[in-house]
UniProtKB/Swiss-Prot annotation:
Protein name: Large ribosomal subunit protein uL24
One Gene Ontology cellular component: ribosome
Source taxonomy: Bacteria, Pseudomonadati, Pseudomonadota, Gammaproteobacteria, Pseudomonadales
GO molecular function: rRNA binding; structural constituent of ribosome
NCBIfam families, per the entry: rplX_bact
Family statement drawn from the similarity comment of this UniProt entry: Belongs to the universal ribosomal protein uL24 family.
Coiled-coil ranges per UniProt: none
GO biological process, one term: translation
Organism (species): Stutzerimonas stutzeri (strain A1501) (Pseudomonas stutzeri)
Length: 104
């Protein structure tokens, strides 16, 4: 079970976007995350009339390593860590500081 999943709100704790918050759009297999509006890079694309792609400079999100982000706890308004707890035979993610479920 992953500690950070798609649609989790995270905060960047290291790098050029330190302190920014965003929502996880995609979790990649190599411990990387794509977060909306964070780690934007410019890609130079060629026009492709066959598929209708217009050329130019396009800004898009690049993946961040999972070690550079922390899950954001809305209750405390701070970065938090994730632990696991078994309730009624199901394993759930909980915030370490408040012991409340992440998905609540």
């Amino acid at each position: 079970m992953q500690k950070i999943r798609r649609n989790d709100e995270i905060i960047v704790i290291a790098g050029k976007d330190k302190g920014k918050r965003g929502k996880v759009l995609k979790v990649l297999a190599d411990d990387r995350l794509v977060v909306g509006g964070i780690n934007l890079v410019k890609r130079h694309t060629k026009p492709n009339p066959m598929s209708g792609v217009q050329g130019g400079i396009v800004e898009k999100e690049a993946p961040l390593h999972v070690s550079n982000v922390a899950i954001f706890n809305g209750e405390t308004n701070k970065a938090d860590r994730v632990g696991f707890k078994v309730e009624e035979g199901k394993k759930i993610r909980v915030f370490k500081s408040t012991q409340k479920p992440v998905d609540a």
